[in-house]
């Protein structure tokens, strides 16, 4: 009885082994696994440079600096008067 059950199992296992790997399990890609990471780094670098250039060329930093300076000056004057 054992031999009768083990023969079909053996045939199925042999057919699976001889069939070969599935297409998704084919030979692994031999390219550098860090290519995707390198591309991500370059994209991030380019976007960061563009963002910094856009900020430095805009008027926003100057306006913010003027606003902070003016607010600080007012607070300083108010503290001098109260003292």
Swiss-Prot record:
Alphabetically ordered keywords of this record: Lipid transport, Secreted, Signal, Transport
Superkingdom of source: Eukaryota
GO CC list: high-density lipoprotein particle; very-low-density lipoprotein particle
Major location (coarse): secreted
Signal peptide range: 1-26
GO BP, one annotated term: negative regulation of cholesterol transport
One Pfam family this sequence matches: ApoC-I
Gene Ontology molecular-function annotations: fatty acid binding; phospholipase inhibitor activity
Subcellular location: Secreted
Cross-referenced Gene3D superfamilies: Apolipoprotein C-I (4.10.260.30)
Family classification: Belongs to the apolipoprotein C1 family.
Function: Inhibitor of lipoprotein binding to the low density lipoprotein (LDL) receptor, LDL receptor-related protein, and very low density lipoprotein (VLDL) receptor. Associates with high density lipoproteins (HDL) and the triacylglycerol-rich lipoproteins in the plasma and makes up about 10% of the protein of the VLDL and 2% of that of HDL. Appears to interfere directly with fatty acid uptake and is also the major plasma inhibitor of cholesteryl ester transfer protein (CETP). Binds free fatty acids and reduces their intracellular esterification.
PANTHER family per record: APOLIPOPROTEIN C-I, APOLIPOPROTEIN C-I, ACIDIC FORM
Note: Apolipoprotein C-I is present in acidic (APOC1A) and basic (APOC1B) forms in P.paniscus, P.abelii and P.troglodytes and perhaps also in baboons and macaques. The two genes for ApoC-I arose through a duplication process that occurred after the divergence of New World monkeys from the human lineage. In human, the acidic form has become a pseudogene sometime between the divergence of bonobos and chimpanzees from the human lineage and the appearance of the Denisovans. Pseudogenization resulted when the codon for the penultimate amino acid in the signal sequence was changed to a stop codon.
Protein name: Apolipoprotein C-I, acidic form
Gene coding for it: APOC1A
